[in-house]
């Protein structure tokens, strides 16, 4: 089968090569179609995404991407947001769990974050009323709320999860977040075997850093989902172990959600774990459950052993050496 591979910026090319090597070692038979995208490509070509990229994703329905840089305060819109809206990948799925061998404050984190991916403030509707007033539109629709809440409960049912918590600020944004919360409660009534509750976003952040094990599945509008995704990654060792899937009706885009790390780009220092774990998510969704399980087990065993690991978790190994160690375990 064919799948699109977008290395992205900074360390992206190095960790994308790790994917190619692991894919070959697992005999997946995937034919990778590689396309450039990101700030570096834009500086060279004047285009954010290489010609043919979107058509290729549309044709095969599967893509895996590395980090792409986005300028702060000005310049082009996030490529991630553009891809999500272009292909209506309405659900962002982030799996967060404690990894043996990675030092953290908690040893029992096991969370799933389901983030609405297409609207909210990320719709990009903002404008200047005059030189001193900027306005942004928080767009929330009932169909999108229902779709993401149903996705969260379906995921919980399929994967043996016991509780789904809605994240909101409906005490202040009574119409927009109020619509999200009321829709969540309507959908929850259809899943009586799954516990359902809700938590205000600021209170949730406090509870996550105090006792994260009290949560199971979190479902949130776009902005809150973005914030708590990184917060939860910090609970288990950082974005170096944060794979993500963007799921639509006909397209799935998997990604490493960490930054492009330009300060170590090209130096063989990057930890490829996140993109390899995202690749494992992709294999699982392709029905290659055994290969996905083997890859995850190899990564976890390598990290737990703690000998041949990258600098971000206390080791001295480079990207290539770590990748080869994982392959040896396969």
Describe the predicted segments one by one.
Residues 4-25, 130-202, 214:
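Glycine-rich phosphate/diphosphate-binding loop of Rossmann-like nucleotide-binding domains
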Residues 99-125, 139-144, 259-292:
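Short, glycine-/small-residue-rich phosphate/pyrophosphate-handling segment
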Residues 43-135, 223:
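N-terminal glycine-rich phosphate/adenylate-binding segment common to multiple enzyme folds
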């Amino acid at each position: 089968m064919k799948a699109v591979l977008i290395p992205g910026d900074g360390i992206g090319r190095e960790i994308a090569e790790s994917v190619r090597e692991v894919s070959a070692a697992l005999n997946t038979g995937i034919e990778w179609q590689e396309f450039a995208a990101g700030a570096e490509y834009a500086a060279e070509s004047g285009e954010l995404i290489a010609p043919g990229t979107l058509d290729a994703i549309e044709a095969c329905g599967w893509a895996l991407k590395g980090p792409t840089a986005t300028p702060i305060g000005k310049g082009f819109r996030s490529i991630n947001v553009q891809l999500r809206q272009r292909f209506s990948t309405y659900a962002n799925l982030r799996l967060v769990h404690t990894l043996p061998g990675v030092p953290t404050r908690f040893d029992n984190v096991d969370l799933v974050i389901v983030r609405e991916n297409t609207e909210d403030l990320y719709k990009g509707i903002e404008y200047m009323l005059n030189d001193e007033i900027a306005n942004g539109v928080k767009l929330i629709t009932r169909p999108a709320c229902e779709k993401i809440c149903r996705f969260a409960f379906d995921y919980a049912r399929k994967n043996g999860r016991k509780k789904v918590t809605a994240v909101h600020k409906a005490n202040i944004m009574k119409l927009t977040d109020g619509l999200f919360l009321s829709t969540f409660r309507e959908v929850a009534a259809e899943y009586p075997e799954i516990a359902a509750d809700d938590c205000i976003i600021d209170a949730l952040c406090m509870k996550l850093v105090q006792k994260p094990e009290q949560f199971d599945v979190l479902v949130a509008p776009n902005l809150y989902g973005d914030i708590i995704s990184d917060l939860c990654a910090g609970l288990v060792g950082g974005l170096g172990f944060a794979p993500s899937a963007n799921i639509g009706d006909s397209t799935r885009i998997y990604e490493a959600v960490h930054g492009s790390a330009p300060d170590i780009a090209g130096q063989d220092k990057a930890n490829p774990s996140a993109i390899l774990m995202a690749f494992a998510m992709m294999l699982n969704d392709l029905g290659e459950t055994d290969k996905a399980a083997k890859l995850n087990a190899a990564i976890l065993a390598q990290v737990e052993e703690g000998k041949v690991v990258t600098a971000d978790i206390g080791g001295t190994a480079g990207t290539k050496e770590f990748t080869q160690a994982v392959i040896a375990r396969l």
